[in-house]
Amino acid sequence: MPDILSQGGDRESGPWPRRIAVAVALALVAAAIVYYLPRSRHGTAQPAQPTATAAPGPVQQGFSGDQGVAAEPDGITGQTSPWPGGLRLPAAGQRPMWFYPATGRTAPIGGLPRQPSGYQFTRAAGGWAMQASSDARTACASCAGPPRTVYFLADSGQSVTRLGLANAVAPGAAGTLWLTRYPTGADPRTAAGVAREVSSAGRPAGSQITLPAGYLIERGTSRGLLLAPVAPEAGTIADRLWDPAAPQPGRTFTGVIAASATQIAWVPPCSTRCRVQVLNLATGRPQTVGMPAASSVANAAFSADGGLLAVELSFSNNSADGAQPVELELVSMATGRLTAVPQTWVSSSALVGFGWAAGGDSLVAELAFTTKVQLASWRPGASRLAIAVLRPGHSPDSLVIGQ
């Protein structure tokens, strides 16, 4: 995660790493590969130490149909708090802007030319990488188009900084970004990309490297680059840690759901009871967190300080329309305990996406109900959500939600 969240539309599903790999061919032909943490239902674009940690509450169990799920079409009701006045979100589009949900006010983001095809956002430490979408046609459906300009928008910035040209962009390990280029017309499923690490000011942070053919950078870590196959084959979907200077291949991970510069979280294949595995790359310490029975992890995102992992839990049910109850929960990396985010027990068709807000410790989610679209914000330890309602025609169509 990720995320550009637009009002309306069909929900995409599936864990984080496969979203990247599966979308690569389309993203390259459109120009840049977008890094999503976690996944939103719309693919046009993608905190600090918490003041307190709520005591773990009871975990809701799976229901038949939508029993126990937030009432629709009214959305989240009951006791809520006003949206924090200083909490703003970027909005994508032909002219990206800052959006203040508390008041509905918008402010322009300087330094960006108008782009009819819109912009894509990639979350990085301290801000976002931005790149124009493109409708350029290439020789084949999965071939790379011409590289395009990458910009950096700081969390507190009012304008962008130009970084360089690339086909793909991914966050680095220490406040940097990785820019990857392919020859125009090359097929990234078989070609090797050339990547260079740059600072948020656009200065080179090292020599360029040639990636293994058929692999793409998901993010930089303290132990090398986390790579994903551009076109994974059934039964071989695995990410790998890769150090260009190391003679031996790095470790592989199947079912990655989230990654930061210092941690990787994944869910091994499971049947009755799933467990999230977390590897601390700095210490080598593994951690196992059990999930509630009859649940699976749909998406996840680490907080900026790495102390919390937000997860979207999906619960089994017998709903005729395929929608399932979901709930947002936080995993404390210090204790391994789960804490339910209050008032987020909703239908999977309602939860558009979620992520950590920039420059703060709040978890933000967008929820689309029949008659309204709501933004929810929650600081760990708070007893209730802060809610803002998005008004059609008065709110941006595509919001970038956190990490």
Label the predicted regions:
Residues P50-G75, A92-Q115, S134-L165, G185-Y215, ...:
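Surface-exposed loop/turn elements that mediate protein-protein interactions on large endomembrane-trafficking
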Residues P90, Q131, T180, A228-P229, ...:
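Residue-level marker for isolated small/hydroxyl-bearing positions within beta-strands
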Residues M1-P17, A27:
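Terminal targeting segments of Actinobacterial cell-envelope proteins
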Residues G14, A31-V59:
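C-terminal region of N-terminal signal peptides and the immediate post-cleavage residues
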Residues V297-E329, V346-G355, A365:
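Loop/turn-rich, solvent-exposed surfaces of beta-rich toroidal or solenoidal domains
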Residues G75-G85, Y119-A129, A168-W178, I217-L226, ...:
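Blade-terminus and WD-like Trp-Asp/Gly-His loop motifs, strongest in beta-propeller folds
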Residues G85-L87, P101:
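Extracytoplasmic intrinsically disordered, low-complexity "stalk/linker" and propeptide segments
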Residues V22-V34:
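Hydrophobic membrane-insertion alpha-helices, especially the h-region
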